[in-house]
């Protein structure tokens, strides 16, 4: 059997022992070794050899064999052409790529196998069809150009028609965080090592060197982009940045087998305007995962796919640009007046994904039903614009001016396309009657054929006197006159036998044959005419590409902000303020997910962090008391403020925060051989090395997984570091000894979460109170968890014995415990250690004592 090794060498080796069709297949397959080849044969796409085995497993289809070639059976699997989209979608969603090989030659004129060639490559990030895409998520292709230990990164949201350039990255960890934040469907790179390691756990491939040639990059930029845009890009960016941009354009050109004309904009992401959150913190804070308790699932109630995707972009890149935030807040307030957003959301709910529809037009993958959806969506725009004009603010007017009322296009589509068109243009039936006179005439020939056949049949019955004569049609033999064999003696000479059946004969006459030729010819001509009209229509639609893209972007923006206005009222959110006083003052803060999922009222808490008072809170109290919730809700509030949403607090005055770091939870990294403690220390080291005075740091119980003294020592050292750097830090701990730091550092304060005991039960107050906790309540929490009574009684006795022996509660011992071994010995200690008391004289001792006193 042939193997992948054979594919690699197919061109170089003798393949003459195979059938001509398999020879053709192997030559094509050798050019697409790492992806599945869908090879068109009649009404099926067939896969052979290892591709067939893989497809059978992935798609749960039958693996068969197609005869023999080179003396061996050929594994084969196939899917129907008309149903291929659903199968391709399954493969693409698994992160795999496909080459579509179509029959491009004419079977009637071909000598040997019909000519075939790959007309399209489908990869996870380069799809535009609705079946392949998540409506609420961008389809992201990332390109990474590694050079001199630096990473140049660009990405495109394929159907959005834009390429974004990211700042140059200098570490693998920074690269990993940036890529995972984008959550791409596919990654390309010039680095084979990076592709092999794949730290992103996403589909990644290393491309040939020419894709990352600066010369080729500039060529593709010039060929793919509008002249003015291309010239601007070439003058604006450095060579390595241009190489990265060009790699995306060259890759798309190769995939599409055409120039990616739908790319109309290149922009640079300014990091200094962004609130940075690494991937671990995103996971810890449950910002945008797929769970029902994620912040995105609670905040994201947009009415359009356009808005849902834009909201995800807001979540990926929260902005610190106060002008942008002020604009969003102004619009939210305007739309919230008299709940005006409700009328807007009602209109938005009728608008389809016009951004992706117009991209499909540009990419040649649009379907007739897409054009109907486009028309219906554009019909909503006058209503939407009128509603927006009722709120005559500069901010809303600016958005409204970018929504284009495309009445001419609506009229064109309404006249051209029937209301419920077929899935494809392949068999016609898409263009509305009355749109094209020539097409109507060609269709009328077929439509009027029934009347002709009725009259023709009646005339033949009268002519030969046989009432059972029938005129019919089948796809194989065409039109015919059918007579029983018992009437063979009455057959006119002009009847020519066409088909013999068991009890009857079928005939054709010259008149019927001429009619058949006319009808079949009209069908072919009508189909050709309809396809020509359809192609011409698409060319007309694409003239509105930029206007529709701009309209789509504006609809997305108003959808997100109407959603924010609705959420503000529904969830009782308030508008945050921003200050330049290095102060974070929050009142009655709530955790939205927990509030949403509990029956009893949520207990809010205040938080105050300030450079003038305290920047670090040591948070103590029992498990389940509310420490983690308190810290998370502060971080989530800051995040919401920086995406432009209102926030879950009665009052929020926020200073400039550039990064949110969190160290929460405990888990092993088994695949990398790292223990829970090692994972914790690695993440802590990352935070310590990167945090600044503008950071918000969440640290939850640092120092677990090692000995008590080691853990306490590390926790204290970390807390001191954060206190010294002035980062706003919420530091939860069960090491009560850390509460002593408030006496040593003026910017450290203690808060704790209270619990009340009644008999043997514990009741959590979930309220943050100034000062340190006095107990941990671990045994009481264990009781709530269901630990058996005998174990609890034993634990109580153990606790009593330990507390009795424990001397660390004395303040002097606490201080002693904090005295970690110094890195250098005290000079006085060195002098004393050097004295030999067995040989020193009393006079020498007095002199030494005098010297020490002078020091």
Curated annotation (Swiss-Prot):
The keyword Nucleotide-binding applies. ATP binds at residues 621-628. Keywords: ATP-binding, DNA damage, DNA repair, DNA-binding, Nucleotide-binding. One of its GO terms (biological process) is mismatch repair. The keyword DNA repair applies. Gene3D superfamilies: 1.10.1420.10, DNA repair protein MutS, domain I, MutS, connector domain, P-loop containing nucleotide triphosphate hydrolases. Pfam families: MutS_I (PF01624), MutS_II (PF05188), MutS_III (PF05192), MutS_IV (PF05190), MutS_V (PF00488). SMART domains: MUTSac, MUTSd. InterPro entries: DNA_mismatch_repair_MutS (IPR005748), DNA_mismatch_repair_MutS-lik_N (IPR007695), DNA_mismatch_repair_MutS/MSH (IPR017261), DNA_mismatch_repair_MutS_C (IPR000432), DNA_mismatch_repair_MutS_clamp (IPR007861), DNA_mismatch_repair_MutS_core (IPR007696), DNA_mismatch_repair_MutS_N (IPR016151), DNA_mismatch_repair_MutS_sf (IPR036187). This protein is involved in the repair of mismatches in DNA. It is possible that it carries out the mismatch recognition step. This protein has a weak ATPase activity. Belongs to the DNA mismatch repair MutS family. This is DNA mismatch repair protein MutS.
């Amino acid at each position: 059997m042939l193997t992948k090794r054979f594919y690699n060498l197919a061109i170089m080796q003798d393949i003459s022992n195979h059938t001509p069709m398999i020879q053709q297949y192997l030559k094509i397959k050798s050019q697409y070794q790492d992806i599945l080849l869908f090879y068109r044969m009649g009404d099926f796409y067939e896969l052979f050899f290892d591709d067939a085995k893989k497809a059978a497993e992935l798609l749960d289809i039958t693996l068969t064999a197609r005869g023999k070639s080179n003396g061996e059976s050929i594994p084969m699997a196939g899917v129907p052409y008309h149903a291929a989209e659903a199968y391709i979608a399954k493969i693409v969603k698994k992160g795999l790529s496909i080459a579509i090989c179509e029959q491009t030659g004419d079977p009637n004129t071909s000598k040997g196998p019909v000519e075939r060639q790959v007309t399209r490559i489908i990869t996870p990030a380069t799809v535009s069809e609705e079946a392949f895409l998540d409506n609420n998520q961008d389809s992201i292709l990332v390109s990474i150009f590694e050079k001199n230990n630096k990473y140049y990164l660009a990405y495109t949201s394929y159907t959005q028609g834009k390429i974004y350039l990211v700042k140059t990255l200098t570490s693998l960890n920074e690269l990993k965080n940036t890529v995972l934040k984008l959550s791409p469907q596919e990654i390309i790179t010039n680095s084979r090592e990076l592709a092999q390691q794949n730290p992103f756990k996403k589909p990644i491939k290393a491309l040939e060197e020419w894709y990352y040639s600066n010369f080729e990059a500039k060529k593709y930029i010039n060929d793919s982009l509008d002249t003015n845009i291309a010239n601007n890009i070439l003058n604006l960016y450095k060579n390595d940045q241009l190489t990265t941009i060009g790699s995306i354009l060259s890759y798309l050109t190769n995939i599409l087998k055409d120039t990616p004309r739908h790319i109309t904009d290149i922009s640079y992401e300014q990091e200094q305007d962004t609130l940075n959150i690494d991937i671990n913190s995103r996971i810890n804070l449950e910002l945008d995962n797929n769970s029902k308790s994620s912040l995105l699932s609670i905040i994201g109630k947009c009415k359009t796919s356009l808005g849902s995707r834009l909201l995800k972009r807001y979540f990926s890149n929260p902005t610190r640009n106060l002008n942008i935030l002020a604009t969003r807040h102004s619009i939210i307030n305007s739309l919230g007046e008299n709940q005006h957003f409700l009328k807007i959301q009602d209109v938005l709910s009728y608008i389809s994904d016009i951004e992706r529809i117009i991209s499909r037009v540009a990419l040649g993958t649009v379907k007739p039903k897409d054009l109907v959806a486009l028309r219906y969506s554009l019909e909503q725009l006058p209503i939407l614009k009128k509603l927006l004009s009722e709120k005559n603010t500069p901010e809303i007017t600016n958005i409204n001016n970018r929504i284009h009322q495309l009445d001419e296009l609506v009229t064109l589509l309404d006249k051209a396309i029937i209301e419920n068109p077929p899935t494809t243009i392949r068999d016609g039936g898409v263009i509305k009657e009355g749109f094209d006179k020539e097409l109507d005439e060609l269709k009328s020939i077929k439509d009027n054929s029934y009347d002709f056949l009725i009259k023709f049949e009646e005339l033949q019955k009268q002519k030969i006197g046989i009432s059972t004569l029938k005129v019919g049609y089948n796809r194989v033999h065409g039109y015919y006159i059918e007579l029983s064999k018992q009437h063979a003696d009455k057959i006119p000479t002009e009847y020519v036998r066409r088909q013999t059946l068991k009890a009857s004969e079928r005939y054709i006459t010259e008149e019927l044959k001429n009619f058949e030729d006319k009808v079949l010819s009209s069908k072919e001509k009508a189909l050709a005419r309809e396809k020509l009209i359809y192609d011409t229509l698409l060319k007309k639609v694409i003239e509105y590409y930029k206007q529709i893209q701009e309209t789509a972007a504006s609809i997305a923006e108003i959808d997100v902000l109407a959603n924010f206005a609705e959420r503000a009222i529904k969830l009782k959110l308030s508008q945050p303020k921003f200050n330049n006083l290095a102060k974070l003052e929050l009142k009655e803060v709530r955790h939205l997910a927990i509030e949403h999922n509990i029956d009893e009222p949520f207990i809010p808490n205040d938080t105050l962090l300030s450079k003038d008072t305290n920047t670090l809170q040591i948070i103590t109290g029992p498990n389940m008391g509310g420490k983690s919730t308190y810290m998370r809700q502060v971080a989530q509030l800051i995040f919401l403020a920086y995406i432009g949403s209102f926030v879950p607090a009665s009052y929020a005055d926020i200073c400039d925060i550039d990064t949110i770091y969190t160290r929460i939870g405990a888990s092993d990294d088994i695949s990398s051989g790292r223990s829970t403690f090692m994972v914790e220390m690695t993440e802590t080291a990352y935070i310590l090395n990167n945090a600044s005075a503008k950071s918000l740091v969440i640290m939850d119980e640092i120092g677990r997984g090692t000995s008590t003294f080691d853990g306490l020592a590390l926790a204290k050292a970390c807390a001191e570091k954060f206190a010294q750097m002035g980062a706003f830090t919420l530091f939860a701990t069960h090491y009560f000894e850390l509460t002593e730091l408030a006496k040593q550092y003026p910017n450290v304060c203690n808060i704790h979460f209270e619990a009340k005991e009644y008999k043997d039960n514990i009741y959590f107050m979930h309220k943050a109170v100034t000062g340190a906790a006095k107990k941990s309540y671990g045994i009481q929490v264990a009781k709530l968890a269901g630990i058996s009574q005998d174990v609890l009684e034993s634990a109580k006795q153990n606790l009593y014995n330990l507390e009795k022996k424990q001397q660390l509660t004395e303040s002097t011992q606490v201080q002693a415990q904090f005295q970690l071994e110094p890195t250098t010995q005290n000079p006085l200690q060195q002098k004393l250690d050097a004295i030999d008391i067995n040989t020193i004289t009393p006079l020498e001792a007095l002199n030494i004592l005098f010297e020490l006193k002078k020091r």
